[in-house]
């Protein structure tokens, strides 16, 4: 059974978040949470919160046991970019 959780509008670059995602791919949930807790990256709390959400979805919606869960697939795609403009005279 596949359980899904999505995080949108994260404030960390996808290239940096992929480094954290690669650390927990294929690991059991407890091991992945321990890795994220001690990883000194800005994306670690975001990925940790996402993992907790996926575990909560599995337990609540599908009545699965947390001990049996592992990270089958995790990926990071690029989201929307903010265009920042400083209105000034350009001439």
UniProtKB/Swiss-Prot annotation:
Gene Ontology annotations of biological process type: translation
GO cellular component: cytosolic large ribosomal subunit
Transmembrane spans: none
Key word RNA-binding present: yes
Keywords: Ribonucleoprotein, Ribosomal protein, RNA-binding, rRNA-binding
GO molecular function, one term: structural constituent of ribosome
Function, as annotated: This protein binds specifically to 23S rRNA; its binding is stimulated by other ribosomal proteins, e.g. L4, L17, and L20. It is important during the early stages of 50S assembly. It makes multiple contacts with different domains of the 23S rRNA in the assembled 50S subunit and ribosome. The globular domain of the protein is located near the polypeptide exit tunnel on the outside of the subunit, while an extended beta-hairpin is found that lines the wall of the exit tunnel in the center of the 70S ribosome.
Subunit structure: Part of the 50S ribosomal subunit.
Similarity comment text for this entry: Belongs to the universal ribosomal protein uL22 family.
Name under which the protein is recorded: Large ribosomal subunit protein uL22
Organism: Clover yellow edge phytoplasma
């Amino acid at each position: 059974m596949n359980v899904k959780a999505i995080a949108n509008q994260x404030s960390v670059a996808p290239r940096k978040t992929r480094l954290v995602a690669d650390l927990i791919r294929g690991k059991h949930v407890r091991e992945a949470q321990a890795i994220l807790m001690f990883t000194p990256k800005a994306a670690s709390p975001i990925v940790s919160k996402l993992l907790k959400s996926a575990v909560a979805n599995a337990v609540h919606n599908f009545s699965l046991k947390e001990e049996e869960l592992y990270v089958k697939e995790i990926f990071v795609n690029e989201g929307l970019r903010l265009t920042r403009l400083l209105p000034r005279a350009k001439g």
